[in-house]
Design a protein with these regions (language model features):
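Conserved non-catalytic scaffold segment of RNase H-like nuclease domains
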Residues: 2, 6-10, 15-113
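Acidic active-site catalytic centers that drive phospho-/nucleotidyl reactions
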Residues: 13-15, 119, 145, 173
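Short, flexible loop segments at boundaries between secondary-structure elements
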Residues: 137-157
């Protein structure tokens, strides 16, 4: 477990206006955390909204808009019209992530957790479209999937719990997913 503890762990979650890899990104949360204790570090953690600012090459899906409208139209309104203090241009967010990830790579390594590959694929696509078409923000070997740990958790009755529903607030969803990871890693650490 020592090798994985030396790495910098980040949970990422996005809220978007499409399920395609070139979706318009409405909200980004990045949370730096300890996978065993679940402790969240303020350094490397942020939660920003992008609203409908121009994102070169991004698409918006009517089906996704309908889904948002049916699922949580009040939160969609907040995402579409963010307060000034919550708003950040996506290009700035991508540069900020790049700096954090490069620092982590130079200091023990980087692991980026998400559900499936959706969030990482969208971030890499946006990075190539907006920042540099010849660079990748997150390398495939740095990606970890929360679903794998949830599957392991389901194998052990002591770890089976009621899974909180996704709120579709990117930061809250990051914290929920960190809970899955922490439950499993703490259980496995006790088995040593």
């Amino acid at each position: 477990m020592k090798a994985i503890n030396n790495k910098h762990h980040f949970m990422v979650d996005l809220e978007t206006l499409s399920s395609e890899s070139n979706a318009h990104i409405l909200e980004t949360a990045l949370v730096c955390f300890d996978p065993v204790s679940g402790e969240v570090s303020e350094h490397g953690t942020f939660h920003v909204r992008h609203g409908l600012d121009k994102q070169d090459g991004a698409i918006i899906s009517v089906e996704t808009l309908e889904w948002w409208y049916k699922t949580n139209r009040n939160y969609l309104a907040k995402l579409l019209n963010p307060k000034d203090e919550d708003k950040e241009i996506l290009a700035f967010t991508l540069h900020r992530m790049q700096a954090l990830f490069d620092d982590a790579r130079g200091d023990g390594g980087l692991l980026v957790w998400n559900t499936g590959t959706f969030d990482v694929e969208l971030l890499n696509n946006a990075f190539k479209r907006i920042i540099n078409p010849n660079m990748t923000l997150i390398n495939f070997w740095e990606v970890r999937d929360c679903r794998s740990l949830r599957t392991i958790g389901d194998m052990f009755p002591r770890l089976q719990q009621t899974v909180p529903e996704a709120t579709h607030n990117a930061y809250e969803d990051c914290i929920r997913q960190i809970g899955y990871i922490t439950d499993v890693t703490q259980y496995l650490a006790k088995q040593d």
